[in-house]
Swiss-Prot record:
GO terms for biological process: DNA repair; DNA replication; negative regulation of DNA-templated transcription; proteolysis; SOS response. The active site is at residues 127, 164. Residues 28-47 bind DNA. It comes from Leptospira borgpetersenii serovar Hardjo-bovis (strain JB197). Keywords: Autocatalytic cleavage, DNA damage, DNA repair, DNA replication, DNA-binding, Hydrolase, Repressor, SOS response, Transcription, Transcription regulation. This is LexA repressor. Represses a number of genes involved in the response to DNA damage (SOS response), including recA and lexA. In the presence of single-stranded DNA, RecA interacts with LexA causing an autocatalytic cleavage which disrupts the DNA-binding part of LexA, leading to derepression of the SOS regulon and eventually DNA repair. GO terms for molecular function: DNA binding; serine-type endopeptidase activity. Transmembrane segments: none annotated. It catalyses: Hydrolysis of Ala-|-Gly bond in repressor LexA.
Length: 203
């Protein structure tokens, strides 16, 4: 792998920091805003860093940035906490009931917010691909029962958990996919059981 320029190191360090803080990468626009450059300039930096073997990008996805190698400025070991991977969420059972837990995975302590309960769900389907969430990813969830409009949440509808963008309307909840082939779900019976705070992906 080739050495990075100072600006490329700074861009890679910014991407690494954002992923550590919120679990998913910044958009090209966010990178441009951080460094005072155009989206085209940010894209050119990403492609140059990719050619040097530090990350991978995917076409037509604003957040599809996958780190392969850390920036030399970000080589400090990361402390981790184990959280449960929840299988099918059964109505009437606590989320952390033994019957629901498939396994445990480590997440960085920066993502684990003190004593706030956290869990993980395996993503199935392609309804959130436009925000870089793919089938097979493990969604890192902060357990909570309230949400703000525009947040990505886990909502329980009858006996099924779904990962969608939350909007509270006057007399119902609207849950939106981030894939145009899926229509919004409008319901009065959805229960919020968590908010997305990160993604765990195995390569």
């Amino acid at each position: 792998m080739k050495d990075l320029t100072d600006k490329q190191q700074a861009v890679l360090a910014f991407i690494t920091t954002i992923i550590k803080e919120r679990g998913f990468p910044p958009t090209i626009r966010e990178i441009g805003d951080e460094f005072g450059i155009t989206a085209k300039g940010a894209y050119d930096h990403l492609k140059a860093i990719e050619k040097k073997g530090y990350l991978k990008t995917a076409k037509n996805q604003s957040r599809a940035i996958e780190l392969i190698r850390q920036s030399p400025m970000e080589s400090i070991p990361v402390q981790a906490t184990s959280i449960p991977v929840i299988g099918r969420v059964a109505a009437g059972l606590p989320i952390f009931a033994d019957e629901n837990i498939e396994s445990y995975i480590p997440v960085p302590d920066e993502m684990a917010k003190g004593n706030v309960p956290m869990y993980a769900l395996r993503v199935q389907g392609d309804s959130m691909i436009e925000v870089g969430i793919d089938s097979g990813d493990i969604a890192i969830i902060e357990k909570r029962d309230i949400a703000r409009n525009g947040e990505i949440v886990v909502a329980l509808i009858e006996d099924e958990a779904t990962l969608k963008v939350y909007y509270k309307e006057q007399d119902q909840i609207r849950l939106e996919a981030r894939n145009p082939k899926y229509k919004p779900i409008k319901t009065k019976k959805a229960t919020v059981i968590g908010k997305l705070v990160g993604l765990y992906r195995i390569y």
